[in-house]
Structure formats: structure tokens, C-alpha cells
């Protein structure tokens, strides 16, 4: 067993080295081309995570797919109102399932200048002890303590840090011919992420810049900052523009679930992301 694992790891390392060399020059060329030809933010694609039969995670009274759609639609309207020179495109406007490769495909076909995917975070269920007539029982309940926001860009993540990537990429399994769509990538195999992460996004630096601006805005309104992180996320990996996935809060946390479902909370989140876009747009167009 150890020998097999070692061989697989060595093969991954060899392929890692090859892919790094293969993609690095193309990445530099694509980035330079973007910076030299796209100096104006004209089109932004807003992606509401999950949808339809893919509800993903849920809280005590709400589902991620519904909250993500509400925030995505409000964000799109806010962009159209405040940035009249920007065209907004949605990957979905109703409760339907859109395949991950179709989401980024929409952005690429529309020649988008930014891709922003809206999601809710969640922690695994934990055991809770309760007593009935002197007898102890245990039940699984949402983790009530973890909270905050984090924003992801496409990139490499260590094996032990793949929880978010595995959860978000699980949507792939709902797609027909998913192995063909993602070049054999298996979202349930941790070793697949080593290679998948090497499909270097040409717009890493720009994506990190936008993600950092989003996190800064969250912090300005008192949110807990969990930082900007790189993950092998299928919805971002093949984007032909700066792309981020922002987790607007933990739906598994009772306080944050109420916040991200409230009109006030959603308005604040939308304003955070909008202001980050405005700041990013001002910077790249100057």
C-alpha cells in the first residue's frame, strides 16, 4: 500500500514539474495580453453558486443556493445602477442547476472582464449532547462557532486544505460526462487536485487584487476576515479573466445565517462587493 502511494506521489511530482513549465510561459503571455488590451471594465459576470437539484449546504432555515441567488441579483442591480458603463451578465437568474464549466464558459463567451461567484460557507456538523428523562442522547447539529468571510482565487492548495474545494467541486458529480468536461478530473480524489491546481489561471495576480479588495470591504463593516486563499476550484480554473469566489458568511452559524438572509445584511454584502469592484475598476483603468 505504501509503495503504491509513493509511486502515485512521485508520478504526481513529475507531472507537476512538467505542467509548471508548460503553463508558465503561456500564463505570462496571456496576462501581458490582458493588461495591454483590456484596460476598461465593460462586462462583469455574476455567478450565483449552485442551484436546482444542487442545493449544496444549508442552515437551520435556509439553503445556500437561495441566498447566493438573492445576493447575486441584488449585486447585479447595484452594479448597473452605480456603474452605468458596465454590462452585467448572470449565470443564472432562477433556481436552476448550471454546470460548473458552463458558468465559466458563459464568462468566456461574453468576453467578461471580471467573474464573481457568490457562495455561502459551512462547517461540518458536530455532535450535541442532550438529556431526556435522565438519559443522554446525541444529535448532529451545525457548527455554531465558526464565522467570517473568505474569498478564493484559482490556484494551488495543500492536500489538508482542500475542504472548500472538495465541497464546491462536488457539484461536478451532478453533471453528465463530468470526466470529459474536466479532462478526467475526479472531485472525490484528493490527488486529482495536485494536477488540477496546476492549470494556472493567467490572471492570478489580478484575481488576488480583487479578492483582497473584497475582503477589505468586509472588514470595514466589522466582518471576521478569514483572508484570501487559493484553491483548485473548477468554476474559476479556466476563466479567461480575473475571477473570484467569495464566501459571504457561514450559513452553519446561527447569527451569520440570520445576517446573510436579512435585507440589511444582504445590502451590506452587496455594497462591500460593489465598492471593491469600483476600487478595482478605478485602479486598472487609471
Language-model features: where?
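Catalytic-site microenvironment of enzymes
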Residues: 1-286
